[in-house]
UniProtKB/Swiss-Prot annotation:
Required for rescue of stalled ribosomes mediated by trans-translation. Binds to transfer-messenger RNA (tmRNA), required for stable association of tmRNA with ribosomes. tmRNA and SmpB together mimic tRNA shape, replacing the anticodon stem-loop with SmpB. tmRNA is encoded by the ssrA gene; the 2 termini fold to resemble tRNA(Ala) and it encodes a 'tag peptide', a short internal open reading frame. During trans-translation Ala-aminoacylated tmRNA acts like a tRNA, entering the A-site of stalled ribosomes, displacing the stalled mRNA. This is SsrA-binding protein. The lineage of its organism: Bacteria, Pseudomonadati, Pseudomonadota, Gammaproteobacteria, Aeromonadales. HAMAP family: SmpB. Its main location: cytoplasm. It holds the Pfam family SmpB. One of its GO terms (molecular function) is RNA binding. Belongs to the SmpB family. SUPFAM superfamilies: Small protein B (SmpB). Coiled coil: none annotated. GO terms for cellular component: cytosol. NCBIfam families: PRK05422.1, smpB.
Length: 160
């Protein structure tokens, strides 16, 4: 008799960076692991993370996540110092790191975190290789979104 494995329902997303898609053209996406401490994992399980103002910086051939806030739980241990905005190392393959370093340094791309999510028992960060948008590009996107919304509304009302 085989055992049925129960899968936990729900969303595996911990945090989204909605501002990133508004402020940048996303050219390519990468998945990176995140080096965390124990209290950070517990806080992430509780969903206490914010990556809205964070960015990725490449130093000495390694990638680091700056500005991400993981709020510690109230029941955290007293002998561990919890720094909510500490710099966290991103875990990428060497070939991916070399490619990203080349693009960021030579072609003026920016690396920004798009989302933080669970992949099995591991926390992953989706990194976007991006270029900044100008103000007129943002307005064009807004007009396009409004047009799509109006078009949907017209099609919905037409069927009535």
């Amino acid at each position: 008799m085989s055992k049925n494995k129960t899968k936990k329902g729900g969303d595996s997303t911990i945090a989204l960076n909605k501002k990133a898609r508004h402020d940048y053209f996303i050219e390519d996406k990468y998945e990176a692991g995140l080096a965390l401490q124990g209290w950070e994992v517990k806080s992430l399980r509780a969903g206490k993370a914010h990556i809205g103002d964070s960015y990725v910086l490449l130093q000495n051939g390694e990638a680091f996540l700056f500005g991400a806030t993981i709020t510690p739980l109230n029941v955290a241990s007293t002998h561990v110092v919890c720094d909510p905005t500490r710099i966290r190392k991103l875990l990428l393959k060497k070939s991916e790191l070399e490619r990203l370093i080349g693009l960021v340094e030579r072609q003026s791309y920016t690396l920004i975190p798009l989302s933080m999510y669970w992949s099995r028992a591991w926390v992953k960060v989706e990194i976007g290789l991006a270029k900044g948008k100008k103000e007129h590009d943002k307005r064009e996107d807004l007009k396009e979104r409004e047009w799509q919304r109006d078009k949907e509304r017209m099609m919905k009302n037409k069927g009535r």
